[in-house]
């Protein structure tokens, strides 16, 4: 089968590889779509941080690996001990493999497992391939009528939703989202469906601001002046930093009220600047969030019900255009691209 194999920074090859077969407790999928994630772009263009160069302690995987963790696919086969899935059933994948034995797994906090592995990074075969094999516990069946493109969006939107859950945001609080990419949009959606006010989404790209406006967001260009000034001098209770950029973190510290909360929802490409003295002076709480923990079902329901609007910012490409998709997203063009590995 054809797959996108990561050999190192700047070296992703479309190769013919053996088709995987499921072992006990595993399910084989025919991949319909796999989304390109910002994490993939970091690995491809910047540095090899999440893909191991030595055998992973849980999976034994190391580079070269097949990329891809934002997966929608249909069930093809199942290994011994797997029940509850039908051939051809559309599912989405929660791509965290966990040990089930450490302190965090025993309390259900699988996203901080001591030996956590991410499918498509620290496992042998990810979703940028015609077929992939995953543990049955990672699968979420989709409701009737959900499309494969919608199902492939569940992972990235669950990342955003976990940040909203971790923040404890509630109606009556003022929030702002810094960064209008997929995680920023998902954060806005997650806040809105909980009745929390999003005073603005901050985004420097005119094209992305146009999409956000179509989605009903109040949009701010950070180049037009201090955020507080653009908000008529009013600070916010909670800031969601989803751009993972040093300038954006600086803006987050300034726009948040004293004793407010700054949520770090995205992983930075470069170290954040030493501006935390402002957090000290304002007694800010800075809280990080990683992946997800129980958000998939709610996100799937929100997508299926039409609460989350996807049509205006999600596009599809064939696998033959994978490198063009990498370059386009790296340049800040487009928002979310889903890859069809079959073409």
Say what each PLM segment does.
Residues 57-69, 97-178:
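NAD(P)H dinucleotide-binding glycine-rich loop of Rossmann-like/cofactor-binding domains
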Residues 167, 171, 194, 210-285:
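Glycine-rich cofactor phosphate-binding loops and adjacent beta1-alpha1 units
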Residues 137, 144-224:
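Mid-domain Rossmann-like dinucleotide-binding core that forms the NAD(H)/NADP(H) cofactor-binding site
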Residues 250, 293-343:
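C-terminal hydrophobic helical "lid"/dimerization subdomain
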Residues 35, 79, 96, 243-244, ...:
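Short glycine-/small-residue-rich Rossmann-like dinucleotide-binding loops
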Residues 47, 204-205, 268, 292:
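Residues in the short beta-alpha loop(s) of Rossmann-like NAD(P)-binding domains
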Residues 20-34, 49-103, 143-145:
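Glycine-rich beta-strand-centered segment in the early N-terminal region that forms part
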């Amino acid at each position: 089968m054809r797959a996108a194999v990561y050999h190192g920074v700047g070296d992703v090859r479309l190769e013919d590889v053996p088709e995987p077969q499921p072992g006990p407790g595993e399910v084989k999928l025919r991949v319909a779509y796999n989304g390109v994630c910002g994490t993939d772009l970091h690995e491809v263009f910047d540095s090899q941080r999440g893909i191991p160069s030595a055998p992973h302690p849980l999976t034994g995987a190391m580079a070269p690996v097949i990329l891809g963790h934002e997966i929608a696919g249909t069930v093809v086969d199942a290994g011994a001990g797997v029940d509850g899935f039908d051939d051809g059933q559309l599912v989405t994948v929660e791509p965290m493999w966990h040990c089930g034995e450490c302190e965090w797994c025993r309390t259900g906090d699988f996203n901080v497992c001591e030996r956590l592995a991410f499918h498509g990074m620290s496992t042998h075969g990810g979703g940028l391939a015609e077929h992939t094999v995953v543990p049955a516990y990672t699968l979420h069946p989709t409701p009737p009528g959900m499309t494969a493109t919608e199902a492939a969006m569940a992972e990235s939107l669950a990342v955003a939703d976990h940040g909203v859950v971790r923040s404890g945001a509630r109606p009556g609080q003022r929030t702002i989202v810094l960064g209008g990419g997929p995680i920023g949009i998902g954060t806005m959606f997650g806040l809105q469906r909980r009745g929390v006010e999003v005073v603005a989404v901050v985004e420097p790209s005119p094209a992305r601001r146009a999409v956000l406006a179509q989605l009903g967001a109040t949009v701010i260009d950070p180049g037009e002046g201090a955020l507080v000034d653009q908000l008529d001098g009013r600070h916010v209770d909670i800031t969601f930093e989803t751009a993972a950029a040093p300038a954006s973190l600086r803006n987050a510290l300034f726009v948040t009220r004293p004793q407010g909360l700054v949520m770090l929802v995205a992983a930075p490409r470069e170290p954040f600047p030493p501006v935390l003295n402002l957090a000290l002076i304002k007694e800010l709480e800075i809280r990080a969030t990683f992946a997800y923990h129980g958000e998939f079902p709610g996100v799937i329901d929100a997508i299926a019900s039409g609460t989350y609007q996807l049509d205006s910012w999600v596009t599809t490409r064939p696998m033959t255009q994978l490198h063009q998709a990498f370059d386009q997203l790296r340049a800040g063009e487009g928002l979310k691209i889903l890859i069809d590995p079959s073409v």
